[in-house]
């Protein structure tokens, strides 16, 4: 197990950092049966971000039809970069006889937090001073998995550049081509160009 953990984390740290700008870009009018959790899932936004964007709601457990909920959204250029990384990874996997990884928005959210954490706390490591290891971080965000891995990078300015860098590193390449992974999340922070890829197998 220790050997597997070392392999998963043996990704060479690529040094060369997009700030996740969140703003209330849209709104949702509550209908009967809605809960904050259902709204969060519908818009692929974390529950804590929805609560933060709606300070006017004193008790998030009690929302009523007709109430207007602000929906925070990630800057579109950020999400397009993240989705392009996923597309490129899946293209590589298919060329290598592997199945595509499924986009997991909750895993993308965790990966964004990791990239932001590296920027905010000025470190570049798989181990966060705030969240611990990638595995501890995923679990603390409610992500369940059978197997998991993480790739990080800093400084690459485009999805193609970061994927090329990862593919030229044996540890990163092993994660991208790991047949046991089934889902992927990518988080990008433009300010400093921090990148995080998180993989899980269920």
How would you describe each model-predicted region?
Residues 1-24:
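Sec-dependent N-terminal signal peptides of Gram-positive bacterial secreted proteins and lipoproteins
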Residues 26-29, 38-77:
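Extracellular LysM carbohydrate-binding repeats and other cell-envelope/extracellular binding modules
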Residues 153-202:
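Disulfide-stabilized extracellular recognition modules
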Residues 78-119:
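A short alpha-helix/helix-coil micro-patch that ends at or immediately precedes a cysteine
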């Amino acid at each position: 197990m220790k050997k597997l953990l070392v392999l998963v984390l043996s990704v060479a740290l690529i040094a060369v950092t997009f700030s996740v700008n969140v703003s209330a870009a849209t709104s949702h009018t509550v209908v009967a049966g809605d809960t904050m959790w259902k709204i969060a899932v519908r818009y692929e936004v974390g529950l804590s971000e929805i609560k933060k964007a709606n300070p006017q709601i004193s008790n998030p457990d009690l929302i009523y039809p007709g109430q207007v909920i602000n929906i925070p959204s990630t800057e579109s250029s950020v999400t397009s970069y993240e989705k392009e990384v996923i597309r490129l990874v899946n293209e590589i996997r298919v060329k290598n006889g592997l199945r595509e990884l499924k986009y997991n928005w909750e895993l993308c959210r965790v990966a964004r937090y990791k990239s932001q954490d590296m920027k905010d706390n000025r470190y570049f490591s798989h181990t966060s001073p705030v969240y611990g290891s990638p595995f501890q971080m995923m679990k603390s965000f409610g992500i369940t998995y059978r197997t998991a891995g993480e790739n990080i990078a800093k400084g690459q300015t485009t999805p193609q550049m970061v994927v090329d860098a990862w593919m030229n590193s044996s540890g990163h390449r092993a994660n991208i081509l790991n047949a046991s992974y089934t889902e992927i999340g990518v988080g990008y922070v433009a300010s400093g160009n921090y990148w995080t890829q998180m993989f899980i197998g269920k």
